[in-house]
From Swiss-Prot:
CDD domains xref list: DEADc_DDX41, SF2_C_DEAD
InterPro entries: DEAD/DEAH_box_helicase_dom (IPR011545), DEADc_DDX41 (IPR044113), Helicase_ATP-bd (IPR014001), Helicase_C-like (IPR001650), P-loop_NTPase (IPR027417), RNA_helicase_DEAD_Q_motif (IPR014014), Znf_CCHC (IPR001878), Znf_CCHC_sf (IPR036875)
Domain Helicase C-terminal: 403-563
Name used for this protein in its record: ATP-dependent RNA helicase abstrakt
Zinc finger motifs (CCHC-type), residue ranges: 577-594
Catalytic activity: ATP + H2O = ADP + phosphate + H(+)
Entry-linked SUPFAM superfamilies: P-loop containing nucleoside triphosphate hydrolases, Retrovirus zinc finger-like domains
Region (Disordered): 1-25, 50-69
Organism: Drosophila melanogaster (Fruit fly)
Record-linked SMART domains: DEXDc, HELICc
Length: 619
């Protein structure tokens, strides 16, 4: 007989009772259920527009009772107030919550900018280690004429206002409206006349007196505004002064260093220095020796000039670091440093290279930074390397030149190359065609040659001799079309370029501004045509759309329809418009694709070994 398990009656009944208690649901009256339903609905609406910081669980428990009552009062039916008054009250509450969302956005942007600003100062390793900080700018012997020194602040501001010059910084120099009043010698004036330059441009009116006075400078002006002369003429004058006081002996120098981001720009800057040096020598003044140090040229050419004593060196970062590492060149005497297109060189990719170059200086120097696109994050970071800098801004940083008519056309990817022939019919030569990829440049070049167009091409994959030959042939007018990657977009000055064609849209809007700035230079008119299609990133198209609106250009329908619902959201917050990181007008820093790419790159480099700086590419 099987054994039957027995249970105690009392324990069984208590277990059943516990189970019954667990399943028990208290009865809630209909009126109370309606009330709770109203609270629930109110909370849903409230959570949608909620922007305050989330509370801890304990705070929520404490506030539940009072919050529930408040929600009933706010969102429930009010019999003693009309529906119109209730609607007005709810609208005010929604507006208040919207304002708090804007404040939250601004607070978030401030945090991002602070995290960027917390990087190491842009100084040499020795200066950072010893905590060296220079408090006063370098003093020079140059002074403006007395009648200009005696101008009142109101008169100076009137000149700046007329020329649309914005100046920031302590006690900036007065603006001077003629080269003769800037006390340039006859040789310089002859050199200016030979190039057909009669009066200074706005950036030169304020920039030249500032640099001649020895002040550190951040110069921002649209492409083709004459920034090069602002740093070339003063360094020639300082070198001349040094040569007069004590002539340079063998292997001495340089006094001035100019760093350029590309070989073509370095070559162009060196040729400008040689032009004015020859005119000075023709007037019986000492020879100013300048040296070009860049990849693709034999080091022996630079060594020849350095061995005789060099006053000015124009260099690209890769070759410069190589020469400094090998002690071919020293910066012991260097007191003048200029970085052309500085935003590119201080940008994340080349920041360490610049810091390495700074560490070779042995004393205080006058530092100048120039570019057409200088976002706030670069300006703030660059100030760590400068002493009481003066910032001169002619037009918004990153704005396109008003002399350029911009046209944007939608063309399918497979039809682009053929469509280039139609674009070439719009204007007379010379024409510049830009493409992102080297293979696209080669493809376009080959197609144009097959169609009988006189074209040349340059990109980073070609050797230096071929690049120089192509640029020279295009510059003197032997060739009608130059096809190039962005290597030709920064700072290069080609005479009378009628038309710039963007075969594709660059990755960021700064490159677009540099590209179209090759035309419409020195108060001439130009045309820029950009071909886009579905492969183009929407964030860049939004930036382009807002750039066209800012420049009062025609916006095509396919761009006008782009993201209309986000048109007004948060683009004008606080003092800034658009993104403070990259300068794009179509987004804020919280959605910046460039910042995101930089952060991803930094994250991917975590844990990797640090490569020696002297192996850096000569970009």
């Amino acid at each position: 007989m099987a054994h039957v398990k027995r249970y105690r009656r009392s324990s069984k009944s208590s277990e059943e009772g516990d189970l019954d208690n667990e399943d028990y649901v208290p009865y809630v009256p209909v009126k109370e259920r309606k009330k709770q339903h109203m609270i629930k609905l109110g909370r849903i609406v409230q959570l949608v527009s909620e922007t305050a910081q989330p509370k801890s669980s304990s705070e929520n428990e404490n506030e539940d009772d009072s919050q529930g009552a408040h929600d009933v009062e706010t969102w429930g039916r009010k019999y003693n107030i009309s529906l119109l008054d209730q609607h007005t009250e709810l609208k005010k509450i929604a507006e208040a919550k919207k304002l708090s969302a804007v404040e939250k956005q601004l607070r978030e942007e401030e945090k991002i900018m602070e995290s960027i600003a917390q990087q190491k100062a842009l100084m040499g390793v020795a200066e950072l280690a010893k905590g060296i900080q220079y408090e006063q700018p370098i003093k020079t012997a140059w002074k403006p004429p007395r009648y200009i020194r005696e101008m009142s602040e109101e008169e100076r501001e009137a000149v700046r206002h007329e020329l649309r010059i914005l100046v920031e910084g302590e006690t900036p120099s007065p603006p001077i409206r003629s080269f003769r009043e800037m006390k340039f010698p006859k040789g310089i004036l002859n050199g200016l006349a030979a190039k057909g330059i009669k009066n200074p441009t706005p950036i030169q009116v304020q920039g030249l007196p500032t640099v001649l006075a020895g002040r550190d400078l951040i110069g921002i002006a649209f492409t083709g505004s004459g920034k090069t002369l602002v740093f070339v003429l003063p360094v020639i004058m300082f070198a001349l002064e040094q040569e007069y006081s004590l002539p340079f002996e063998r292997n001495e120098g340089p006094y001035g260093l100019i760093i350029c981001p590309s070989r073509e720009l370095a070559k162009q800057t060196h040729e400008i220095i040689q032009h004015y040096s020859k005119h000075l020598q023709a007037c019986g003044m000492p020879e100013i020796r300048s040296c070009l140090a860049m990849g693709g040229l034999p080091v022996s050419e630079a060594l020849d000039v350095i061995s005789r004593g060099v006053h000015i060196v124009v260099a690209t970062p890769g070759r410069l670091m190589d020469m400094l590492d090998k002690k071919i060149l020293t910066l012991d005497m260097c007191r003048y440093l200029c970085m052309d297109e500085a935003d590119r060189m201080i940008d994340m990719g080349f920041e360490e290279d610049v810091r390495t170059i700074f560490s070779f200086f042995k004393g205080q120097r006058q530092t100048l930074l120039f570019s057409a696109t200088m976002p706030k994050k670069i300006q703030n970071f660059a100030r760590s390397a400068l002493v009481k800098p003066v910032t001169i801004n002619v037009g918004r940083a990153g704005a396109a030149s008003m002399n350029v008519t911009q046209q944007v056309e939608y063309v399918k990817q497979e039809a682009k190359v053929v469509y280039l022939l139609d674009c070439l019919q719009k204007t007379a030569p010379p024409v510049l065609i830009f493409a992102e990829k080297k293979q696209d440049v080669d493809c376009i070049h080959e197609y144009l040659l097959l169609k009988g167009v006189e074209a040349v091409a340059i990109h980073g994959g070609k050797d230096q001799e071929e690049r120089s030959r192509a640029v020279d042939a295009y510059r003197v007018g032997k060739k009608d079309v130059l096809v190039a990657t962005d290597v030709a977009s920064k700072g290069l000055d080609f005479p009378n370029v009628q038309h710039v064609i963007n075969y594709d849209m660059p990755d960021d809007i700064e490159n677009y501004v540099h590209r179209i700035g090759r035309t419409g230079r020195s108060n001439t008119k130009g045309l820029a045509t950009t071909l886009i299609n579905k492969t183009t990133e929407q964030s860049v198209l939004l930036d382009l759309k807002h750039l066209l609106i800012e420049g009062k250009q025609e916006v095509p329908d396919f761009l006008d329809e782009l993201a209309p619902e986000t048109e007004h959201q948060h683009l004008d917050l606080g003092d800034s418009h658009g993104c403070t990181y990259c300068g794009g007008l179509g987004h804020r820093i919280t959605e910046c694709p460039k910042l995101e790419a930089v952060q991803n790159k930094q994250a991917s480099n975590i844990g990797r070994r640090d490569y020696l700086s002297n192996t850096a590419a000569d970009y």
